[in-house]
């Protein structure tokens, strides 16, 4: 079923290389379901892993190749996260009231392909749990008036290079994550505070709502 208000650790879809170990030279892709928020590979206890997962829903493009939680996945198991859109809460002082929610979606009405990384973690029970994180960068253009960060939107002509597990050149991978002029890709509209509760879930959450007054 469609989920219009995804919370950390909820299931999300990813597109990944069909053969994450790089033996398939055809570059075929596979759709998979994972849990949102990467689990650090060194963790051994479920409670600790879930707590860590909630803190790792996003990975910064500037440091992803260095952070212990993310660096191995960045080098070998990258993915695309297809999304109808995403919510962001205003932090820019003076322009919008604090925590004014916005829904940001593709201008063409299609799916937004967001850059991500994924990994598998084995729980103490032996269960293998696949998890993923969204990659973010400094906000650009109009999105900068809402929040200081934004997802890395991955153009179609970069998908094959991004998903190829044999592509381990850090500089090339970092160059793929550079996105400028996001306003040509996405459009933002203010929405109701109803999205603040994960108990609310429906397409109506994405309907444009009047802007709240900024605090003075």
Where are the model-predicted features located?
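Short, surface-exposed polybasic-and-hydrophobic patches located at secondary-structure transitions
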Residues: 95-108
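Short, His- and charge-rich active-site/binding loops that engage polyanionic ligands
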Residues: 1-78, 105-109, 115
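Cytochrome P450 core scaffold surrounding the K-helix E-X-X-R motif
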Residues: 90-97, 163
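A motif-centric signal for short, conserved binding hotspots located
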Residues: 105-125, 132
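Short, catalytically relevant binding-site loops at active-site mouths
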Residues: 86-88, 110, 120-121, 141, ...
């Amino acid at each position: 079923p469609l989920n219009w208000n995804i919370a950390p650790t909820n299931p999300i879809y990813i597109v990944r290389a069909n053969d994450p170990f790089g033996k398939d030279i055809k570059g075929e892709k596979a759709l998979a379901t994972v849990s949102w928020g990467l689990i650090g590979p060194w963790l051994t206890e479920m409670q600790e892993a879930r707590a860590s997962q909630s803190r790792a829903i996003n990975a910064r493009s500037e440091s992803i190749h260095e952070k212990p939680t993310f660096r191995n996945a960045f080098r070998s198991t990258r993915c695309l996260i297809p999304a109808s859109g995403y919510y962001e809460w205003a932090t820019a002082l003076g322009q919008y009231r604090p925590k004014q929610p916005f829904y940001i979606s593709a201008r063409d009405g299609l799916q937004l392909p967001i850059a991500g990384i994924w990994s598998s973690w084995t729980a103490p029970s032996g269960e293998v749990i696949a998890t993923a994180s969204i990659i973010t960068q400094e906000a650009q253009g109009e999105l900068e008036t809402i929040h200081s960060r934004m997802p890395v939107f991955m153009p179609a002509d970069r998908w094959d290079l991004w998903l190829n597990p044999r592509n381990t050149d850090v500089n090339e991978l970092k160059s793929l994550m550079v996105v400028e002029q996001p306003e040509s890709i996405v459009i933002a509209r203010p929405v109701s505070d109803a999205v603040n509760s994960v108990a609310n879930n429906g397409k109506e959450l994405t309907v444009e709502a009047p802007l709240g007054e900024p605090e003075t």
